[in-house]
């Protein structure tokens, strides 16, 4: 996978994740019945809004999966852009195209990037499901 990563920021984040897992390994475990993806985290993490904070951020937008993901995905893209001095659009490209990752709102209360294969493989009810209840 690293051979296909040409962006230096993306490459460093992938190498950092690999090094952490090479040294410590990782275990998928559950918290309150949901998988915690922290062991597979790539790059930074950002605290996700509480239900009250999310409702305030949504304002007059419809309360649905797309509008919720728009807010949380923007949070991780903006953090990546801020940390690495890049645009939000380039951050989105780094996440999806360079790293082949998905933004994941974890049971731990943070959003971060995880490899797409893991996000699809480990069945979970994420943040969006919890917020729509």
Describe the predicted segments one by one.
Residues 1-102, 106-133:
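Nuclease and nuclease-like effector domains acting on nucleic acids or nucleotide cofactors
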């Amino acid at each position: 996978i690293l051979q296909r990563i040409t962006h230096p920021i993306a490459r460093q984040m992938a190498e950092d994740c690999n090094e952490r897992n090479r040294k410590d390994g990782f275990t998928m475990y559950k918290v309150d019945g949901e998988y915690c993806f922290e062991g597979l985290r790539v790059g930074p993490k950002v605290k996700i809004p509480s239900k009250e904070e999310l409702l305030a951020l949504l304002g007059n937008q419809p309360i649905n999966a797309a509008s919720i993901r728009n807010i949380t995905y923007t949070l991780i893209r903006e953090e990546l852009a801020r940390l690495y001095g890049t645009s939000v659009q380039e951050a989105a490209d780094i996440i999806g195209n360079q790293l082949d990752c998905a933004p994941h709102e974890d049971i731990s209360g943070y959003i971060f990037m995880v490899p797409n294969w893991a996000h699809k493989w480990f069945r979970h009810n994420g943040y969006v499901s919890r917020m729509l209840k």
